[in-house]
Amino acid sequence: MSAASTEERRPVHDILGIGFGPSNLALAIAIEEHNRDAAESDRLSCAFFDKQPRFGWHRGMLIEGTTMQVSFLKDLVTMRNPASGFSFLSYLKDQDRLADFINHKTMFPTRVEYHDYLEWAAARVGHLARFDSEVLHLTPVPEGFEVVVRHGDGRLTTARARNVVFALGLEASVPDGARLGDRVWHNLDLMHRVGELDGTRPRRLTVVGAGQSAAEATDYLHRTFPEAEVCSVFSRYGHTPADDSPFANRIFDPLAVDHFYGAPEEVKEQLMSYHRNTNYSVVDLDLIEELYARAYQEKVRGEQRLRMLNASRVTDVAEGPDGVAVTVEFLPTGEREVLDSDVLVYATGCRPRDPFPLLGETARHCERDERGRIAVERDYRVRTRDELGGIYLQGGTEHTHGLTSSLLSNGAVRAGEIRDSVLRHRRAARSAPDYALSRG
């Protein structure tokens, strides 16, 4: 009997998660907490598949000393269930660091510590996750969906579920025409690839981008390679500080999602425009001041190892075996300079991974708005034309749900809303007359 046919004999899952980063991890915890207190008939069965060999969240950006830009209280659970045993505070207690963290007097743990928290939480629901397992496509079936999975050893298996939840995370975004290569990296891979420079004594490193990731990459490379010139190229005249003021931060509140979802399209566009400086192409003020102070002290000493090439853009990139020639244009004058660099790092942002290649023929049943964007209900369920199982999106919903679509800020609440939506639809299905007849 084939592995696929063996899989088909298993019960149909209520929820099948595709991807197991922070968003679907929060969902797994929400399901686990529901099942702990629910009667057996009300529990949810679930499984999560992730193509990574083990849990990981942006490992290539885990620069030592960098801090989270979101409060630890916006962890996997607290905004949904402050009493949860999966909170960041519970993690600290388990690690015997609670008092130490309190004495640290910060709301923002380092990224390395927060990643350790995520790994700790993932291990506690590890029985729900299947790593080294890539979902290839899904097909509608009477029970919901049949999902084909390729495992690390090459086996293909199938699983069935009434609902699927996509949480595919982010992928690198680079300028049109740009190509990554041996000497051209994206900052998502910075910590994975920086070891390639060991023993090479690089002379010049160039970073392109205007946001937090670009500033962090610039700072890290400048500190790590004390003999190298580090050039930061960005089109603004100066780095823009992130607006993390209290009133602006309300745009990340759960209530703001309600307001945004119900707003007219022109109001949504206004809100996105007003508050882009909370998240996009902005830098923490402390880091801006640190980079400026460093550049100034170099000027005092009569050297210039940190170069901030503001109001500039890259016009050409020529990669060779020993380096990459980066042509930079100063926008006010049009003057061009070629930077012969050992490495070029694009820190030009990320975009949500598109789930629709996995949907196959199912995609034609998904409704779209007048702009061709996917139509999504308030509970993150894709609106479909026919009676399909539930398709839920964690990410890629900025046009309907606002800035928190791909951020950690609302992850705990969103997970609870998706779980509760699945329960609500299941109750409705069970109360239908044809369900009672089929059970009789």
Which ranges hold each PLM region?
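Flavin (FAD/FMN) cofactor-binding and adjacent substrate-gating region
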Residues: 67-100, 259-267
